């Protein structure tokens, strides 16, 4: 059948028409296999044709893409040669070929330097200008070299105090018309605080605890400090002690009355303030000198002996009780 079809295609004649009997007769199995095989071959041929056409188009696209990449590289290289390579090569050639000019210029600079040195004359270390040349520049210590600045530390627990200081500083700036930093404001506030009190020399009024610890011992053991330590303020009129429950104990009342008499006799405490702190050989030290110079123990023992002999307390002992 295939040959018949091919002959028909070659000769160009029409195939013979089949009768109805031929069409209605059952076809053999081999004929059906031949038809199926022809159909599969036709489908395979069409698929192969399409595949060949796709491969050809893909090859054409890849060739075109490779051509474009090569052309792009050529254009980039040409641009690099025109903009970079050629100017750099020209400059290198000029520098290499201009060694004669370099020698002439170097010789001229050397001649100028020698003329300048000859004009200045001899240079000594005692006579030099630091603006021109300073031989001690490297040995000097620059105070601004590697200077580290740390921002001020703001304690969150003292935020209320910081806000209050900022408000006061703003008010002071509005009053004076001058901008103050925190450090300057603290100094002004310290001066204003000290101006409210009378200035007392040799006192702890203007001394902080850290400064007080740094003071020498001769200031603490001075005459003024000793006098200040001996002063005691006592109010003899006020008494918070009730004496009524002690009326049944006469011996306690008698001892209290004796102490009162001693205190009233030695009431004038100005004697201690007026009497100078001095100790001479051959004189008995006073109570104040005994406390300052370390004679308090011997004096108290002698006064206790006198009290035991006379039966009444000595006036010096009452004076010491008042001062302590």
Curated annotation (Swiss-Prot):
Source domain of life is Eukaryota
Q: Which InterPro entries match?
A: FAM228
Stored PANTHER family:
FAMILY WITH SEQUENCE SIMILARITY 228 MEMBER A, PROTEIN FAM228B
UniProt lists the family membership as follows:
Belongs to the FAM228 family.
In its UniProt entry, what is this protein called?
Protein FAM228B
- Organism, scientific name: Homo sapiens (Human)
Gene from which the chain derives: FAM228B
């Amino acid at each position: 059948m295939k040959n018949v079809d091919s002959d028909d295609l070659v000769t160009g004649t029409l195939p013979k028409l089949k009768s109805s009997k031929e069409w209605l007769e059952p076809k053999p199995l081999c004929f059906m296999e031949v038809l199926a095989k022809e159909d599969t071959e036709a489908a395979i041929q069409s698929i192969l044709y399409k595949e060949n056409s796709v491969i050809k188009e893909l090859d054409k696209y890849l060739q075109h893409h490779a051509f474009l990449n090569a052309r792009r590289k050529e254009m980039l290289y040409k641009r690099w040669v025109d903009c970079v390579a050629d100017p750099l090569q020209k400059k290198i050639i000029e520098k290499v070929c201009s060694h004669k000019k370099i020698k002439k210029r170097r010789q001229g600079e050397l001649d100028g330097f020698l003329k300048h040195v000859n004009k200045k004359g001899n240079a000594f270390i005692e006579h030099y200008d630091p603006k021109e040349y300073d031989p001690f520049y490297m040995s000097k210590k620059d105070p601004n070299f590697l200077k580290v600045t740390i921002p001020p530390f703001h304690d969150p627990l003292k935020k209320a105090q910081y806000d209050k200081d900022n408000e006061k500083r703003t008010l002071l700036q509005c009053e004076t018309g001058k901008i103050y930093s925190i450090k300057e404001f603290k100094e002004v506030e310290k001066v204003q605080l000290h101006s409210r009190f009378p200035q007392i020399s040799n006192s702890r009024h203007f001394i902080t605890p850290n400064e007080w610890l740094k003071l020498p011992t001769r200031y603490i053991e001075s005459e003024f400090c000793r006098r200040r330590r001996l002063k005691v303020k006592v109010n003899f009129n006020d008494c918070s002690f009730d004496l009524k429950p002690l009326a049944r104990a006469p011996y306690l009342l008698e001892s209290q009355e004796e102490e009162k008499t001693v205190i009233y006799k030695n009431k004038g405490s100005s004697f201690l303030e007026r009497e100078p702190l001095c100790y001479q050989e051959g004189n008995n030290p006073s109570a104040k000198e005994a406390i300052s110079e370390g004679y308090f123990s011997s004096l108290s023992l002698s006064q206790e002996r006198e009290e035991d002999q006379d039966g009444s307390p000595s006036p010096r002992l009452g004076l010491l009780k008042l001062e302590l």
